[in-house]
Amino acid sequence: MQKTVLEPQRGFSFENCERNAALQRALPGLRVPHARKTGTTIAGLVFQDGVILGADTRATNDSVVADKICEKIHFIAPKIYCCGAGVAADAEMTTRMAASNMELHALSTGRECRVATVTRMLRQTLFRYQGYVGASLIVGGVDFTGPQLYSVHPHGSYSRLPFTALGSGQDAAIAVLEDRFQPNMTLEAAQELLVEAITAGILGDLGSGGNVDACVITAAGAKMLRALSSPTKPIERSSQYRFAPGTTPVLSQTVVPLTLELVEETVQAMDVE
């Protein structure tokens, strides 16, 4: 029985990264691939009955708005959700993998998965790839220990906080949260604060925009609130831009007759059998 010379290794392969570095040293002026700037505003906070997560809905490709209604709040478990910022594909696939693993974990143990379990798996996965998976995540949920909120960074570091914000608009969002957050807030007050924080990120960052999505997680379950607020509504036209024929004068007119020559005519019979 023949075997391969090298056994397949698990984890991320850094061969292309080392190749790019060697080419850059050997060929001065060579343009090597660089990380693309991403834009998002995501936030979350803990209130008296659970956790509420929020995000904007704009997906960008450099300076181009690729999607205006992108969904950035991902399902992990019935009472655990995750907001993703950074590279959209990385965040989507990372959260899908986490959701699949948590479902297998729940089936094998017969218990609901904990928020700390999800966070541990996500940070171990991101740490293994040393930041090359560009996903900044906010994990929020409710388990038997109560409501919990975690922020997980692309290199694998994490923090458990009562409120947090990530993304390119995090500075404006965290400023609002730090100013108005209070422990044991009601759902109405927490929802209003979250909308104001995401709105501040949208108005203060070109990479964020669209609507404000939210997800309320309590011990009874989770509820998605799509398009909870629209801080950047389209500007309505003050009047109709329709002009009567003849408003713009025609100064000159030239008519060029177009002659057509039939080169070949083919008739294809239809098969009726």
UniProtKB/Swiss-Prot annotation:
Alphabetized InterPro entries for the sequence? Ntn_hydrolases_N, Pept_T1A_subB, Proteasome_bsu_C, Proteasome_bsu_CS, Proteasome_sua/b, Proteasome_suB-type
Q: Which Pfam families match?
A: Pr_beta_C, Proteasome
Q: What does the record note about the induction of this protein? A: Up-regulated by interferon gamma (at protein level).
- Catalytic EC class: hydrolase
Q: What does the UniProt keyword field contain? A: Acetylation, Cytoplasm, Hydrolase, Nucleus, Phosphoprotein, Protease, Proteasome, Threonine protease, Zymogen
Coiled-coil segments: none
| The protein's Enzyme Commission number | 3.4.25.1
What is the recorded name of this protein? Proteasome subunit beta type-10
